[in-house]
Amino acid sequence: MSRRSDLSDKDSQSRKRHWLTDQAVTNEEKEQSPTKRTRKTKSQGLGGLFNTFFGMFVSSNSGEKEKTEVSGEVQVQEDDEIIVEGTTRRVAENKKYMIFLNEDAPVRANAGSEENEVIIEKHVQKNVEIRNDEEKQEVQGDLVLTLSSSPKSPKNLEKSFEVQQDDEEPDVLFEKVVKTPNKQLQEARRFQNELIFLNDNPDTPDDVSVISDSRSKEFISPTPDDSVSRPITPSLSSLSNYTSNNVRDYWRRNSAKKPEVLRRVPVRHQFKHSTSVRKMNTIIDLKKIKNHLSSRDRLLQGVVASGQYEAKAISGIVEKKPKKMQRTSSTDILARAKNKIAELGGSRSNTPSLLSREPSIIIDSEESTSSSYRQHARSNSSESDSYRKLNDILSQINSLGIGSAYRGPQRYQNSYQLSKQKEDKLLEEARIREGHRSQTRGDRLEDVRKRLELQGIAIRPKVEKKKVDDFMALPDAADALVERAWSGGNPNEQFVDAFSIQICKKDLATLSGLHWLNDEIINFYLQLICDRSNGDSKYPKIYAFNTFFYSNIVSKGYASVKRWTRKVDIFAFDIVLVPVHLGMHWCMAVIDMGEKKIEFYDSLYDGNTAVLPALRGYLEAESLDKKKTAMNFSGWTIQQMTDIPRQQNGSDCGVFSCQFGEWASRRTTPRFTQKNMPYYRKRMVYEIVSKKLLATI
């Protein structure tokens, strides 16, 4: 054993045996092995000295001759077959060479079928005679070492060994008994490695990450076993290239937790035909199917070659076929096809484009369908006639070109072109008409104006009014002022004093939330409207009665309010605002002297009929008292307004009435709604405290 270890250190390949080295046997390698018998040298003492001087003399006289050493060049195949190809010339002192009596590969391969066979390999050291072949020396420069093949039994091996040895007995290094043929052992080991590889590395799709679980879809920290630096797991088609050296991964740690990428498939399932076909996104990958089938066949061959199972037991798996797809009855398919052809035949007269369709234009899916039907028809002889008829019907259907991808555009191409041309003509006509209309619009208006002037009707051109923002944003100071007015504190705190009216905190508090407005707020706001008209001439002149005016007229008559206007001529104003209080509801009446109309605004529209007659009687009495003439109401319009904003609760009537008066003072139609009431409440607080209205014309 020490002999083998010393020689193996000089070879880089661990699988080569120690007697296959290409170097000459040195003096250190001459040490006797434990199994080698000691041989006495014939030349000892004076005889040995004489032989030494004689060898030196002969070597000096024969300088032209060269002493050669033959070392065996050995080539090792993948299955460790040992073959002697040839020898090379080298000078050696002892002329002893390493040979072995293994038989060549073809003979040993043929011998693998014998069951009870015993092969004894004897590795000896012997003087070898060199047969010089000039022809081979010129071509290869090598000497051929001829070995006679012997039968495969211990006795034949011993006889061949005795024939080859000379007078001296060869040195037997060691003997090795091989109970099983070498090639069969290698195949059995390779198949065992493949099974180990299948158990350790299940076939997983390449697109699954090693750090994620496809079932839980939760992130899993990678372990050393799942490092991305490791090579990708090879497919089953490349398992035959792996040996025992690269099957096991020694870097793997058993304690490391492995992520469950996919459920492991047992090895026995690899032999099933159903598991060898995998569908990805409903598309069958034929290349993967072939690889799985080839891997399955390779594994079955390995099982048989290893001798673990008999070929008869495995034949049942090979001959097992997949279940046939359940198909509908052929009679039903024929009946449906005939009905479809009848429908298409009846519609062919209405669709002339189908007659001109080439029968060669069909969809690929239909071709594949017909071909699949043909394959099934060939496999099932009992239904061959039915499938032949079905194929004929399908060919007729395909010849019509119903499934053609180009049928639609070609069928409607002419109609599309006609509609496109018609559309282009209409667009061009519309463009010409619009251009002519824009050029002659002024002339036509002038002609109409002249014809109307001849009839006595004048048409005034419309004057574009300036757009006014009726809901402008409040200034920044308004929020602070409103917060101060509506916060807790002394309710008698005075905020403003104008128009002989004092506004305190308790008065401003009526504008918060859904509180009812009191008399001070309404009177003060109406005075702001009058003050704005006095300061700017573009506004109509406004006069406003206080909140007690209408109550006195109704309850006490004209005499109770006669002295209220002794210094004021209400007929000199353009608009007179009359706030109307109906007990628990506020309304607004507007008397427009310039436009001769009396309007009553009620946000609830409860059908009150007493307000308008009372105001008309007041105007008649006031005219007789101040002008000494009767009031002439011819041409006047007295009505209750209906198309006005309506309140949606029972607390905003005071705000509605004030805004009706403000919009009427500008002679504009009110456009606010219930949703604007919170805005108007804050705005009225700011306008009252600042004594200035924000709305303008």
From Swiss-Prot:
Keywords: Hydrolase, Nucleus, Protease, Thiol protease. It comes from the Eukaryota. InterPro entries: Papain-like_cys_pep_sf, Peptidase_C48_C. Residues 501-664 are annotated as: Protease. PROSITE patterns: ULP_PROTEASE (PS50600). The active site is at H585, D602, C653. It is an enzyme of class 3 (hydrolase). GO terms for molecular function: deSUMOylase activity. SUPFAM superfamilies: Cysteine proteinases. Its main location: nucleus. Disruption phenotype: RNAi-mediated knockdown causes increased presence of smo-1 conjugates during the first embryonic mitotic division. It is found in: Nucleus envelope. GO terms for cellular component: nuclear envelope; nucleus. Its EC number is 3.4.22.-. Belongs to the peptidase C48 family. This is Sentrin-specific protease. It comes from Caenorhabditis elegans.
